[in-house]
Design a protein with these regions (language model features):
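Basic, polyanion-binding surface patches
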Residues: 2-177
Length: 177
C-alpha cells in the first residue's frame, strides 16, 4: 500500500469559478413554496447564493438549480417563503440541500405553518413572503428575482453561514484550513 502526498478524492484541477464562489460564502436561507390551498406540491431548497436589493418594494435574488422541484413550484405558484436559517438549523439545511436523508420527506423534519405563500418554518424568527417576478438563466443556475410582500425580522441569534462547502458560525470566520 502506498501513501499518497495528495488528497485521493480531490479534483486536482478544481474549477476556479467554483472555488471563488466557495470562498465568498454567505448566509444560508431555506426557500419553500406550495402546499395548502395553493394546490401545488410542497417543495423547498437550501440556498446560500442570495442577496437582497433595497427599494420599494425590496427584492430577494437567488441562484437555484433549474432542475430542482422548488424552481418548478415557484413558477407554478408565483410565491414562496424565504427563511434565514440559524446555527441550530444546520441539519434542516442539509436535508433541504439533499445531503441528509429525511424518511417521510423533507417537511417531516420540522414544524411548519402553511401560509398562502408556502410552508413557513415555525421556529424561524426572520422570514420573507415573496412573489416571483422573473427567472433568468445565468450560467448553470436560474436567477430568481422575487418581490418582498411580507417580512418578519426577529431575534438575530447565531446565523448559519456557508463557506467552502461547510456550515460555519460567524465566529469561525477563518473557515476550514
Amino acid at each position: 500500500m502506498t501513501i499518497h502526498t495528495e488528497h485521493p478524492f480531490l479534483d486536482p484541477d478544481a474549477d476556479p469559478v467554483r472555488r471563488l464562489r466557495g470562498r465568498l460564502g454567505g448566509a444560508v436561507t431555506l426557500w419553500t413554496s406550495g402546499g395548502g390551498d395553493i394546490g401545488a406540491e410542497r417543495a423547498g431548497l437550501t440556498v446560500s447564493s442570495v442577496m437582497v436589493s433595497g427599494g420599494e418594494p425590496g427584492r430577494v435574488l437567488a441562484l437555484v438549480d433549474p432542475d430542482c422541484s422548488l424552481r418548478d413550484v415557484l413558477e407554478e405558484t408565483g410565491r414562496g417563503v424565504v427563511h434565514l436559517l440559524r446555527w441550530h438549523d444546520r441539519e434542516l439545511a442539509e436535508v433541504f440541500a439533499g445531503q441528509m436523508p429525511a424518511p417521510g420527506g423533507q417537511f417531516t423534519t420540522a414544524e411548519w405553518e402553511q401560509t398562502a405563500f408556502g410552508p413557513r418554518l415555525a421556529s424561524a424568527t426572520t422570514w420573507a413572503e415573496v412573489e416571483v417576478e422573473s427567472f433568468e438563466p445565468v450560467g448553470w443556475s436560474d436567477l430568481v428575482v422575487a418581490r418582498i410582500v411580507g417580512l418578519e425580522v426577529g431575534e438575530d441569534g447565531v446565523p448559519l453561514e456557508h463557506r467552502r462547502g461547510r456550515y460555519l458560525r460567524p465566529s469561525d470566520a477563518e473557515g476550514p484550513a
